[in-house]
UniProtKB/Swiss-Prot annotation:
Belongs to the SIMIBI class G3E GTPase family. UreG subfamily. The gene is ureG. This is Urease accessory protein UreG. It comes from the Bacteria. The lineage of its organism: Bacteria, Pseudomonadati, Pseudomonadota, Gammaproteobacteria, Pseudomonadales. CDD domains: UreG.
Length: 207
């Protein structure tokens, strides 16, 4: 039987449209020359996020697997993660030397969490366009994720959101837990996410 190493599994969750797929694309492009990476995406009825990442050239197509969850996307990453676990294992066996597998959840709500059997680290993405109140609404995505990304800071003036208020509320809701503002269109905040993954995932700095 061919042996393979167990990769670091990083769960990426967040509401629809918050920027999960954009974050994954940016992470893959920034890290692929230094680490062996693969991705599992989740969509309810399609494999749209897999297609987006493939067409963007985030990774080689065979390193990106789409899972059609059906029903509630929360269930597929928490209560019954069997489809995702199977996809992760299949990728790990196929490549043998994978160091990181990103698992992107389908669009979900603030209560969504990853099963510890599926994700070693969790990143949760929200966006400023949802309003400055989002951090203080709490929920496990806000309070319990290992790293929080508040994306689309460039939209703050257009939606009447105060980044100062969001910063204050975030620090109050998740004291001692890391987070960052980001504008992924310009790459802002990306390095903070990479540094977190490398440090907490004990990957070793390369490049």
């Amino acid at each position: 039987m061919q042996s393979y190493q167990q990769p670091l599994r990083v769960g990426v969750g967040g509401p629809v449209g918050s920027g999960k797929t954009a974050l994954l694309e940016a992470l893959c492009k920034a890290m692929r020359d230094h680490y062996q990476i693969a991705v599992v995406t989740n969509d309810i009825y399609t494999k749209e996020d897999q297609r987006i990442l493939t067409e963007a050239g985030a990774l080689e197509p065979e390193r990106i697997v789409g899972v059609e969850t059906g029903g509630c996307p929360h269930t597929a990453i928490r209560e019954d993660a069997s489809m995702n676990l199977a996809a992760v294992e299949a990728l790990a066996r196929k490549f043998g030397n994978l160091e990181v597998i990103f698992v992107e959840s389908g669009g979900d709500n603030l209560s969504a969490t990853f099963s510890p059997e599926l994700a070693d680290l969790t990143i949760y993405v929200i966006d400023v366009a949802e309003g400055e109140k989002i951090p203080r609404k709490g929920g496990p995505g806000i309070t319990k994720s290992d790293f929080l990304v508040i994306n689309k800071t460039d939209l703050a003036p257009y939606v009447g959101a105060s980044l100062e208020v969001m910063e204050r509320d975030t620090q109050r809701m998740r004291p001692q837990r890391p987070w960052t503002f980001s504008n992924l269109k310009k790459g802002e905040g990306l390095q903070a996410v990479i540094d977190f993954i490398v440090e907490r995932g004990m990957l070793g700095v390369r490049g």
